[in-house]
């Protein structure tokens, strides 16, 4: 029996002194019933399967393209058995959902307009090497399987992850393609760029057009920059976009080579144009002039009400024309799309010709800003940030490091101490809708805000807390995610988190059109929701006054010239500087921690003392926690974290930990208020401090009975009884002999028997 015909193509990406990475695409061996199936390999050890399928018939009454992207993480890929009760994979991890979004965002605009057949792309992680990320490889796999599927898809598109690793004087700084997780620890910036290769009019290859960008400064970037590494400012980020182009070109070439051998012919899928030219002309004739006035109303609600009223009038007029036979009956089903298209022309034309936006602002103007902290009682930190009609509430909660998130996924990242959760309730846009578990968009927005702030967080040693930041979008009219970054900076400072620098974010938009035979671009600062919906780009940039901490770019175009993006980056910095001044006016330094926040301190103990501190079955550590009311957690390196609701409780626990793990040798003559823990025929054992017991011999017990003979220690002392004792002898093995301190002796020594702990005799 003959086996399947297997074809492959590969790209070798040269990383200079860091070696090379090989990306290989293979088809024909597995998943042969899918319209397109490609196995993508990274250096032969990481393997993904991407399968693209399409329904046979278009969906009726759909006015959008029904594309679904799913990422399936298989535990066997990393040699693991799932940790769930049923020992099988459940719902997608947060990391898998984020990769779904990375694939969907550049692929969706690459399908032909008007396609209504359901298309599903399933990427399954079959094998992953330790220290590797699979997200950028998944973008390429999804594009390759779609490219050979016979669907009307204007690919290939390619994605590459780059890390900027400083040369530290010995070498030049270098952008490394497909870096390992360990290499990211040495990097100051992490960048995922997706693009396509344009074709010139003469059929030759043109420039690489950028379709999507995800980027962030790394967790270690601050320390690296302080040590002399390059700051990832706007110029450096623009260089990174250029550095990605050769790698994208190679990956696109490999996909094209595979498609040349294996692609199916483009099938004849029905395409449903959103409207006919006749419908568009009719709507434009009825609505254009009034829309010009509507899109000069600054207030969102007032503008929406005027727009809705006009829309109803135009629709009624269109219905009359259709009823009279002057217009095709399908015009009514095409009306909404045609009306939106006319609205887009009105808005874009005014911006490009006059440089004036919907609310009357210029291209670089920011809406009114407002910032306020400490607005919610009892929480550890809170703030409200408002930019125009976008209003975000930020709330910070602090806890011990043992509350950090443990991540069970195929990502090299296994735990996170900073969690950022974003909520977008329906009332934020004046609507009704479902509330409950977060949707993919909310997860993505929260992760973007998280990435923006991680580079400026204090280290675990400087601030030993787990931090949960929640952003509530209370009102939305453009870029709630960047508003979340600003509100979070305020809230974290209000909670007493010593940020290394404040961070602000701004959303940039892009309008492009052919005016007088020339393609013009206009970058918009601080876009409205309508400018996002009717524009060509959503470009979010967050950072400090010195460097960029996070970027997210989405576009509805086939690609954007990198020169346009570089200009938008510089424009975003000016806006960011303005916002940072407003944040600084609201709070310019960390506040004192709230009384309701836990106090966490740390103690370093020898590793060989960890077992002694824990005690048999946790007896010792539990006793300290019960006695002091503190929570204690221990890291493998001997770092002990102590958390309590107040400082004295934490200090009491630290003192007891030090007695056990960092002990000072007890001396004869020291006095302790101890606790009787065991009675024997020859005396009583008294606990002086956790892990330190001494023997009160029966001959010494007699002193407590006035010198009379004692038949049983139980007649004089009971378990749990407090007794003031003095160390009288320490033998060669460290065993302690005790004697009771009688009332007259205690008075002589001036000892307050109400306080526990050692006292000098």
Swiss-Prot record:
PROSITE patterns: KH_TYPE_1 (PS50084), S1 (PS50126). GO terms for biological process: mRNA catabolic process; RNA processing. Mg(2+) binds at residues 532, 538. Residues 598-657 form the KH domain. The keyword Metal-binding applies. GO terms for cellular component: cytosol. Its cofactor is Mg(2+). GO terms for molecular function: 3'-5'-RNA exonuclease activity; magnesium ion binding; polyribonucleotide nucleotidyltransferase activity; RNA binding. Gene3D superfamilies: GHMP Kinase, N-terminal domain (3.30.230.70), K Homology domain, type 1 (3.30.1370.10), Nucleic acid-binding proteins (2.40.50.140). Residues 669-741 form the S1 motif domain. InterPro entries: ExoRNase_PH_dom1, ExoRNase_PH_dom2_sf, GPSI/PNP, KH_dom, KH_dom_type_1, KH_dom_type_1_sf, NA-bd_OB-fold, PNPase. It is an enzyme of class 2 (transferase). Keywords: Cytoplasm, Magnesium, Metal-binding, Nucleotidyltransferase, RNA-binding, Transferase. Its EC number is 2.7.7.8. It catalyses: RNA(n+1) + phosphate = RNA(n) + a ribonucleoside 5'-diphosphate. It is found in: Cytoplasm. The keyword Ribosomal protein does not apply. Involved in mRNA degradation. Catalyzes the phosphorolysis of single-stranded polyribonucleotides processively in the 3'- to 5'-direction. NCBIfam families: polynuc_phos (TIGR03591), pppGpp_PNP (TIGR02696), PRK11824.1 (NF008805). Belongs to the polyribonucleotide nucleotidyltransferase family. This is Polyribonucleotide nucleotidyltransferase.
